[in-house]
């Protein structure tokens, strides 16, 4: 058993309360490898932002659970080495699907876990979430639950259709489970293809597809039912067109990839939506930089020569999200 505090990590409780009060959102960036983690930590330190290192079940299997624990501890030490004396770093399980997975993460040093029972009948979701909460809270680990289903595919999570969160269920769910935050469905979706072309309209000036707006009425109804309660948005990558264009220019094939407009995420971040998940944008930034390097330097075979530019491109993306979208820069509890 390893407690997250021994690794220098923090849970989400205080940072979420501060974010709601301050009208900004904490970035939750998924990572699978060292370069992504380096880019996330460097961006967070340079912008003085709290940050959530987010790991899916599949990413944990890919990276290895033991190595992941030491990577998280190393992330804290790396932040200090870069000059941040009091980093606020969360290690969070994204879309945990069983009690056993959540328990394993808690026991190996995660400071926050998500138990996703949204695909289950309501009462089963309540029971599963409560079971995880009861275990996690013994170790001061925070728990994210979910009501509503996001469409799309990302990692091992997939759904054909989305189901908006029912605001009439949220009080009962939060009260009976004791969860610390709630992921809701308001029209975001997983992956780089968040909307079908027929759901969008074409901007006559650019010829680009423009997605439909998010269903903020659902968010507002949830906030009315649970005032001050931390809300989470999944599937919130914006799918930057410049990264898609670069990938396609250098041999990729991403047709009609479209994400969530950043102005809608800015609007969400100014409310009780205090955690916004971003994964696909990082994948796109990494892939674009690697494809560009391969095309421009076809004789290159040193991984550092293409993973380095990929890391730099991801860092640029993370800083942009922190400063220009989520508003979490200079929000560390201790700025020194």
Located regions from the model:
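Generic N-terminal amphipathic, Lys/Arg-enriched alpha-helix
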Residues: 1-27, 300-301
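A short N-terminal beta->alpha junction/helix N-cap motif
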Residues: 3, 24-32, 59-60, 305, ...
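Charge-dense, low-complexity intrinsically disordered segments
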Residues: 6, 62, 119, 209, ...
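Alpha/beta enzyme core
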Residues: 10-21, 34-59, 66-86, 95-230, ...
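Short catalytic-loop micro-motif centered on adjacent basic/acidic residues
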Residues: 26-30, 91-92, 114, 231-233, ...
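An acidic- and aromatic-residue-enriched active-site/binding cleft used to recognize and process polar
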Residues: 148, 236, 281
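Short catalytic/ligand-gating loop segments at beta-alpha or beta-beta junctions
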Residues: 233-239
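C-terminal alpha-helical cap/extension of soluble enzyme domains
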Residues: 249, 260-336
């Amino acid at each position: 058993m390893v407690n997250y505090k021994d690794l220098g990590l923090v849970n989400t409780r205080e940072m979420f309360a501060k974010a709601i009060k301050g009208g900004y959102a904490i970035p939750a960036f998924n990572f699978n490898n060292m370069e992504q983690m380096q880019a996330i930590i460097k961006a967070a330190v340079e912008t003085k932002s709290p940050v959530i290192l987010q790991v899916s079940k599949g990413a944990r299997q890919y990276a290895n659970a033991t190595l992941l624990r030491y990577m998280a501890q190393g992330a804290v030490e790396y932040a200090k080495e870069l000059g941040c004396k009091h980093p606020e770093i969360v290690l969070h399980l994204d879309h945990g699907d069983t009690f056993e997975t959540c328990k394993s993460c808690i026991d190996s040093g995660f400071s926050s876990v998500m138990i996703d029972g949204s695909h289950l009948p309501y009462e089963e979701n309540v029971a599963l979430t409560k079971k995880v909460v009861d275990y996690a809270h013994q170790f001061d680990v925070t728990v994210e639950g979910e009501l509503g289903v996001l469409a799309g595919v990302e990692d091992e999570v997939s759904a054909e259709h989305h189901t908006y969160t029912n605001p009439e269920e949220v009080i009962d769910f939060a009260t009976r489970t004791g969860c610390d935050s709630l992921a809701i469905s308001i029209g975001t979706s997983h992956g780089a293809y968040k909307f079908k072309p027929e759901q969008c309209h074409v901007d006559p000036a650019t010829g680009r597809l423009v997605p439909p707006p998010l269903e903020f009425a659902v968010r507002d109804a949830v906030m009315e039912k649970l005032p001050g309660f931390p809300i989470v948005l999944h599937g919130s990558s914006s799918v930057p067109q410049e990264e898609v264009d670069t990938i396609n220019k250098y041999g990729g094939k991403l047709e009609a990839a479209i994400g969530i407009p950043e102005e809608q995420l800015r609007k969400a971040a100014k409310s009780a939506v205090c955690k916004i998940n971003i994964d696909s944008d990082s994948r796109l930034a990494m892939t674009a930089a690697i494809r560009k390097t391969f095309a421009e330097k076809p004789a290159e075979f040193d991984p550092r020569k293409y993973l380095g530019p990929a890391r730099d491109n991801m860092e640029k993306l993370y800083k942009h999200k922190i400063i220009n979208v989520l508003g979490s820069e200079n929000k560390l509890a201790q700025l020194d």
